[in-house]
Amino acid sequence: MKKSILLALFTLVSFVTTAQEVKWMTMKEAVAAQKKNKKPIFIDAYTVWCGPCKMLDKNTFSDPKVAETINKKYNPVKFNAEGNEEIQFDGKLYKNPAYQEARKTSRNAVHEFTYFLKVQAYPSMAIMDSKGVVTNSIIGYHTPAQLLPKL
């Protein structure tokens, strides 16, 4: 009996936890989703070495109200601004030609898509309309209370 109750409780907690996470997509997935649901794209431009970026993940994007708001209003994309991902967007291929695999866990070259987004600092969040225009940029670490009104 105790095992059944514990199992049920664990299952419930697991379900609630996963329901409160931002459902990140690739840029390709977000563009495809946007064609169907007409929601803007929310892009979190981060780097692997950025302390405030990690705090944003841990403290802000994990907040149930923030996650719910982002999932409801946007097609969310998590983008490594110094990563090696190739992004096909609006008829153009964006790459990071100077990317160095040996530096993948530290500072690296800036991705071409980062320049397209006009990222000035990390972390940066960009909201993009259906025409591919960045309509709003949010720069720096924000607590849930600070970020929610901007969403």
Please place each PLM-identified region on the residue numbering.
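Short gly/ser/thr-rich secondary-structure transition/capping motifs
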Residues: 22-26, 58, 106
